[in-house]
């Protein structure tokens, strides 16, 4: 019977109630339709080949809009008495308030803006519970360099690779041995290893620290502290607190770059501070959302960092013995990548991935030689991956946020025999060979073997041909690698996942082959591992560990 027909036979005193009963299904249908529309839009986004963080954000927005639709329906169309409507709407938004900046719960995010953990907002952060300072050693340490050192960010090359060792593939028969595991301060710094010692950077309360450990025992032997703490609000808070860069150990000195721009030179044997610069203050540069992250680069007698100033002081070189400024050049904001030294067209130059350009500087003078546009925003779709020279004056570029990787060709013409960049006759150009949606690294970097590039594309292991950019395979495992880090060791890739799992993968261009795995540490892990011979150091913002990995005999040379 229709609503009209029922109304004709309904007593007047019941008309209002019956009409409401007829209208209510339409109101429910509107709410269900709104939810269905949001679900469909979210599904389309998740089925599209875009960055995982965009997918997660779309889901969060959809949930907020769904709650908004439900609360609007309760207030306007539910038929509940007025006090009950307001209480019900408030109850719906209570979980949102709980995790808001005003609520009692602080969420710990992973690299895709997903939720990895939580803690009570009033509880002290992990780094605030640790010992702040460590006394310097009473005797100077004996630092002995070896051919297995891992002395800086990514070791000794353009990508993380350890040569001269091979790893056992069967970790059931040959288990990695845990030598030590202990709490460390916050931050995303990696370890630099020389001889029997390893150095990293940590945040402990209000002190940004440089800490030296015994490699095989984890014993702290010296530390240096600066009164600094990078703990940004807003979107920057997603990156957490503490230093990001990895120390550089060179010629008995430890060079460090803190998240607030403090550049230190420290005596490796004693932990004594030799010289220091507060670079952002001295050069009038502003920090970037997630803090200064580039690791110091040694170039001859200088140590070079990206200051990010806009007035001919984007890249700055300091005399590594005295700390005096040697030169400053460039006018771009920093990214989160580190400068590298290479040679292109017979000219030594420093490559710096800036906010939205790849810039090449003459190694001796800092003069800008050439630039190549590279889409980025250091407060948004930031660049954090290294430029990779691959031979033939070509450079491989990659980053996250859905930006395509590129292989570019650099050419120098009209050479006059003088140092490049000192005469107008020197002309440089950079042209794109290919640009494809492969190997879209975000926090990590790629490795290269036999003309094949391996890396983590968003959250999946990826493999592509260097010459063409053609993808050979892409693999999503469970649990996912997330925004982890990788090291090439012979014919194997050692991956440290975002959740702290150690995964051994064959460097096979034909298919993904997982050889072994081990849960190494717990918590969000963006730090690069360091491998010295069989000794692997891993860490995150809460704990560090050293494993002795089983070695396999090196293949014989015929």
Model segments located where?
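Loop/turn-rich, solvent-exposed surfaces of beta-rich toroidal or solenoidal domains
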Residues: 403-405, 436-507
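Aromatic (tryptophan-biased) beta-strands that constitute blades/sheets of beta-rich domains
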Residues: 121-183, 209-236, 272-281, 285, ...
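Internal/C-terminal transmembrane anchor helices
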Residues: 82-107
């Amino acid at each position: 019977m229709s609503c009209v027909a029922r109304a004709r036979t309904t007593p007047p005193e019941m008309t209002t109630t019956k009409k409401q009963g007829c209208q209510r299904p339409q109101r429910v249908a509107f709410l269900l339709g709104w939810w269905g529309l949001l679900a469909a839009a979210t599904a389309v986004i998740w089925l599209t080949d875009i960055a995982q963080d965009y997918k997660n954000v779309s889901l969060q927005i959809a949930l907020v809009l769904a709650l908004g639709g439900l609360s609007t329906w309760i207030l306007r169309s539910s038929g509940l008495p007025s006090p009950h409507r307001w209480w019900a709407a408030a109850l719906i938004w209570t979980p949102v308030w709980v995790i808001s900046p005003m609520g009692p719960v602080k969420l710990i995010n992973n690299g895709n803006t997903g939720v990895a953990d939580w803690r009570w907002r009033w509880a002290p952060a992990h780094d605030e519970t640790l010992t702040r300072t460590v006394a310097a050693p009473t005797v100077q340490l004996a630092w002995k360099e070896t051919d297995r050192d891992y002395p800086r960010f990514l070791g000794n090359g353009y990508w993380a690779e350890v040569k001269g060792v091979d790893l056992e593939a069967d970790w059931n028969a040959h288990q990695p041995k845990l030598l030590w595991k202990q709490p460390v301060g916050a931050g995303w710094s990696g370890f630099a290893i020389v001889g029997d010692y390893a150095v990293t950077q940590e945040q402990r309360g209000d002190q940004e620290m440089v800490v030296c450990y015994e490699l095989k025992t984890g014993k702290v032997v010296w530390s240096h502290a600066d009164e600094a703490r990078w703990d940004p609000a807003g979107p920057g808070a997603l990156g957490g607190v503490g230093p990001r860069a990895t120390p550089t150990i060179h010629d008995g000195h430890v060079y460090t770059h803190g998240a607030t721009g403090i550049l230190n030179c420290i005596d490796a044997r004693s932990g004594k501070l030799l010289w220091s610069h507060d670079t952002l203050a001295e050069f009038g540069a502003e920090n970037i959302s997630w803090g200064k992250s580039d690791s110091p680069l040694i170039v001859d007698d200088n140590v070079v960092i990206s200051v990010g100033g806009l007035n001919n002081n984007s890249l700055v070189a300091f005399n590594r013995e005295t700390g005096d400024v040697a030169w400053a050049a460039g006018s771009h904001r920093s990214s989160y990548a580190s400068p590298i030294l290479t040679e292109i067209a017979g000219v030594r130059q420093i490559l710096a991935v800036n906010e939205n350009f790849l810039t090449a500087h003459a190694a001796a003078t800092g003069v800008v030689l050439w630039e190549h546009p590279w889409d980025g925003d250091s407060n948004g779709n930031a660049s954090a991956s290294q430029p990779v020279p691959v031979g033939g004056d070509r450079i491989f570029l990659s980053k996250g946020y859905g930006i395509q990787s590129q292989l570019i060709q650099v050419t120098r013409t009209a050479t006059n025999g003088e140092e490049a960049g000192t005469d107008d006759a020197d002309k440089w150009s950079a042209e794109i060979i290919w640009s494809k949606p492969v190997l879209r690294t975000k926090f990590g970097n790629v490795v290269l073997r036999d003309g094949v590039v391996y890396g983590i594309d968003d959250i999946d292991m990826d493999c592509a041909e260097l010459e063409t950019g053609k993808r050979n395979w892409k693999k999503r495992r469970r649990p996912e690698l997330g925004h982890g880090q990788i090291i090439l060791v012979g014919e194997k890739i050692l991956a440290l996942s975002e959740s702290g799992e150690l995964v051994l993968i064959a460097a096979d261009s034909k298919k993904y082959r997982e050889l072994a795995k081990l849960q190494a540490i717990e918590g969000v892990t963006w730090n690069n591992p360091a491998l010295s011979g069989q000794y692997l150091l891993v860490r995150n913002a809460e704990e560090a560990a050293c494993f002795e990995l089983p070695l396999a005999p090196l293949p014989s040379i015929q």
